[in-house]
């Protein structure tokens, strides 16, 4: 298979742990000829704690499980109505540095939101994407064997209240927002493919294929 090709999988609504395990298995077993993949998924409610995450940032988890992750960053929340995009890229093959990939993912979200006239921006002091001072997208990556995994989570049409149970990404009082505030009918089903197309454009439009999960 042509190495530059990217396979795109729609996984729907899934528990966090099996998808995380599948992502690790994919990364551990891939070689120089394995095509890159992008996974679109929504997760059942879960807090994920980053590799350097501090327990004090998990305030009152209540009935939502807290799962340790090996991505960068602090604690965040995933739930239905949030589009998670995992980027499983061979950075060496694509001649991308880690910082370049972070910038590229942030720009992907900025470009996606611009389609709906939402003026968003990254911040030098806090990874992710913001509208004004409010965070709309979280970002966390891990690199192994020159390949990326984990990715981004864009708030679209969800219950934001669980974010009040944590210090999102380690910032006390960080206000979260979502696309629904500006676009009433936004859904992951609509926004997910747009995110993928914006990312592919920034990767110079490599060949890609949507495949069944």
From Swiss-Prot:
Locations listed in the record: Cytoplasm
Matches recorded under InterPro entries: aa-tRNA-synth_II/BPL/LPL, BPL_LPL_catalytic, Octanoyltransferase, Octanoyltransferase_CS
Positions contributing to substrate binding: 71-78, 138-140, 151-153
Location of the active site: 169
Alphabetical list of Gene3D superfamilies matching this protein: Bira Bifunctional Protein, Domain 2 (3.30.930.10)
Lineage top rank: taxon: Bacteria
Keyword Cytoplasm: yes
Key words of the record: Acyltransferase, Cytoplasm, Transferase
Marked site positions, Lowers pKa of active site Cys: 135
Alphabetized NCBIfam families for the sequence: lipB, PRK14342.1
Family, as annotated: Belongs to the LipB family.
Protein name: Octanoyltransferase
């Amino acid at each position: 298979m042509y190495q530059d090709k990217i396979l795109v999988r729609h996984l729907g609504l899934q528990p966090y742990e099996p998808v995380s395990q599948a992502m690790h298995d994919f990364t551990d077993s891939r070689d120089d000829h394995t095509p890159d993949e992008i996974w679109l998924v929504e997760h059942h409610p879960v807090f994920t704690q980053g590799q350097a995450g501090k327990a004090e940032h998990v305030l009152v988890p209540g009935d939502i499980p807290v799962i340790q992750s090996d991505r960068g960053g602090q604690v965040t929340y995933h739930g239905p109505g949030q589009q998670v995009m995992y980027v499983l890229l061979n950075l060496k093959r694509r001649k991308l540095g880690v910082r370049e990939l972070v910038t590229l993912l942030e720009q992907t979200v900025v470009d996606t939101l611009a389609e709906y006239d939402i003026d968003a921006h990254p911040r030098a002091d806090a990874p992710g994407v913001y509208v004004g001072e409010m965070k709309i997208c979280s970002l966390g990556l891990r690199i192994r064997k020159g390949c990326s995994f984990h990715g981004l989570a864009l708030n679209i049409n969800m219950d934001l209240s669980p974010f009040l149970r944590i210090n999102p990404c380690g910032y006390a009082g960080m206000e979260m927002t979502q696309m629904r505030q500006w676009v009433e009918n936004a859904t992951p089903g609509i926004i997910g493919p747009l995110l993928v197309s914006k990312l592919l454009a920034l990767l110079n439009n490599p060949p890609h294929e949507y495949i069944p999960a």
